[in-house]
Amino acid sequence: MKNTLFALALLVASSARAQQVPDTGFKPPIPNPAYASGRGPRVVVDGGHHNFHTADGRYLPFAALLRRDGYRVSGSTSPFTADSLKSADILVIANALAAVNSEASGNWALPTPSAFSADEIAAVKRWVEAGGALFLIVDHMPMPGAAGDLGRAFGVEFSNGFAGLKDPTGARPPNIGPMAFTVANGRLEKGPWSEGRSAAERVESVITFTGSAFYPGPKVTPVLRLPEAAVSLTPSAAFEFGPETPRVPVAGWCQGAVLEAGKGRVAIFGEAAMFTAQLAGPQKSPMGMNAPEAKQNFQFLLNLVHWLSRAAGMPNG
């Protein structure tokens, strides 16, 4: 029975992944934009590291939302250097991959080497410490392998797997589907990301959609905290689960966190769909900010970016 359940999970998850398209009709209200149109900080979305999500692809709704809030959003295919980073106030890296694990390769199996060179990681760290803001978004395996070295540079350790919740009865495999982080259930920590600039921007609930877990170092502030039942399934190939797939206990680990690094700021999140709006599978089911259960995700994203850019009116801004 467990073998059948694992096979079904593989079929459903891998099918949805292959058919994700941006929901260009997603336009939630922004009654109080942080900046005048086209006058806000420069947000550069990485597209130069075989990224599964880019500003003109699956992260198009992400880019569109920030533009409506006044940010100047562009994509970039340049390697990370001191010169290339001069064009950014906020650098967004979403689901970067090494060439061997690119979407085009069709190979989401181990090994999963770094998507970034040592020189690029050093350049990003220096840029942040000088005042830049990094938004690092790392989905399930193989993405944590690709981003692991960059994460370590900022004090976090990723599990190269799929974060899920154990079945209380033990009769079913862990659930790697949507996960709720709320103030009420204790998984969403309060802070600028939840409070926003006013009561109208307050967030009580955030939904994630199949991501990774990471261990926060001592200088890292948890935002989304995984519960006691959390485990990380670490298969040798993405979505290829079985009864023998290793399970790493990750209770108390994070799926979202922030930190200060020198003069700069960093937000690290272990799930990507939560920050975009997609239509998944043959039925074009909403997944992400457009999902009915994720109504506050878009405001959570805006609050995070307001914190990164030190927008006027933000707590600790």
Where are these regions (language model features)?
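Hydrophobic h-region of N-terminal signal peptides that target proteins for export
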Residues: L8-A18
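Short, surface-exposed patches at the edges or C-terminal ends of soluble domains, predominantly
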Residues: A18-G317
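Sec-dependent signal peptide recognition
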Residues: K2-A7
